[in-house]
Amino acid sequence: MIFFTITGSLTAAIVYDRRERRRVQQKWCDLVAHLSKETLPIEQTRRKLTIFLSAPPGDGLRIAREHFKEYVKPILVAAALDYTVIEGRREGDVRAALAERIRKHRRKAGEPSSVVEEMSNEDIIADARQKIGVVEEPGPKGDLVIGRHTWKEYIRGLHEGWLGPLDPPSPPDAPVKGPSVPVEGSETPADGTPAEENTEKKEEAEKKDDKPAKPSGPTPAYVSPAEYSSRSLPPTLPQSLDSSVPIPFPHLLGFLNTPIRLYRYLSRRHLADEIGREVAGLVLASSSRPYHDGSFSSDSELSGAMVDAGASTLSSPDDMMPSSSAKYEQQTVLEKEESEWHKSVHKRDEENPDKEREWIDDIVLDPRIASRMQRSLLSADEEARSQRITEGKEYILGEERPAPVSFWQRMWIKYGYGEDEETIRMKPIIGNLDGADGE
């Protein structure tokens, strides 16, 4: 009896959570589904978002991909939006990729640089589209950042790309070793090996040097956080950057944390609701606000009109110099996730303790960049409409809610030989091919 009680309770909790999670996700999908019905001119491509994700501390990239596919991708598919994914397998990959992307944009805008870029597949496709007159759909874009660790790399890469130089810094000088002095009166060098063997080893070393060496890590940063205040803003920096949305990515490891992990597994509907609201706000792009700094309270909300008004005042590169006492909202976003990271992540490299660590170092912001960042929000009207969708009073914009389907009919359609009305409607109607007399 005890066994059946525990098993039945656990099964009921799992089934209930999955059903509620599907219902919550369907609400946010219905909220943005009207965008997929909009038609575009033949010379325009769909609006594209940028997804930033990286392997969580202490785990692999597959976990981050599953988190994206489970909570974020269904809403993007419902809105029929295009997206680009920037992935990072190691610490610093997202930072390096974003910084290089911004530097590439600055070079294309006309800023002088001695770097000769190679044509990538994306450049070839973009050049072909430009020749035939295909342009992107006008409208606001956005960046969706998954997890606190990715968010810290995103902030670092944003500053490095806009404040750093376009040309890579010169590598540090390697220590010069003195030549070995051979012993007089002997035919072998000082190491005791014959001269022929040394010659063969040198030839093998030269062959190895000819092969391109694999990078041992991400590209080193072009500028350090301590140099932010001394760098001038590039002329191609816009008055306001694309909107960004940090997405929570709780990832707790360890056997002793099993009760917490079990509770989170049985209450994933709340996480789906929170992520769905943030993603829907970025997809609809109906409202945005600048991130708060030390002068704003956490409860204050600024409208999208104040974004342009605040950004227009930053016309000089020397405006708003860094203040050590300022506390920005970007520094506290998803801060609770850091306490759940594996303890091995917080260890410094004993051989190189001064090495930069994007995940464990404090977030350093330059006010000139931080004030240009915006955060997408779900407007009050869209929030009210999502509530009406939950209550069944409203459906996708421009459509009526279909008639409810019974449980048994739904099972017959899903697992049996039944067909829903939409599938039947899409079937071609073939007339009598044998003629009127049936021959």
Curated annotation (Swiss-Prot):
Record GO cellular component, one term: cytoplasm
Keyword Mitochondrion: yes
Predominant place of localization: mitochondrion
Record membrane topology: Single-pass membrane protein
Transmembrane stretches, start-end: 71-87
Ranges of compositional bias, category Polar residues: 227-239
Keywords: Membrane, Mitochondrion, Mitochondrion inner membrane, Protein transport, Translocation, Transmembrane, Transmembrane helix, Transport
Top-level taxon of the source organism: Eukaryota
Region (Disordered): 164-239, 309-328
Biased composition (Low complexity): 315-325
Annotated Pfam families: Tim54
Extent of Basic and acidic residues compositional bias: 198-213
Mitochondrial matrix topological domain residue ranges: 1-70
InterPro entries associated with the record: Lipid_Phosphate_FormReg, Mt_import_IM_translocase_Tim54
Family (UniProt): Belongs to the TIM54 family.
Subunit structure: Component of the TIM22 complex, whose core is composed of TIM22 and TIM54, associated with the 70 kDa heterohexamer composed of TIM9 and TIM10 (or TIM8 and TIM13).
Function description: Essential component of the TIM22 complex, a complex that mediates the import and insertion of multi-pass transmembrane proteins into the mitochondrial inner membrane. The TIM22 complex forms a twin-pore translocase that uses the membrane potential as external driving force.
Identification of the protein by name: Mitochondrial import inner membrane translocase subunit tim54
Organism of derivation: Aspergillus fumigatus (strain ATCC MYA-4609 / CBS 101355 / FGSC A1100 / Af293) (Neosartorya fumigata)
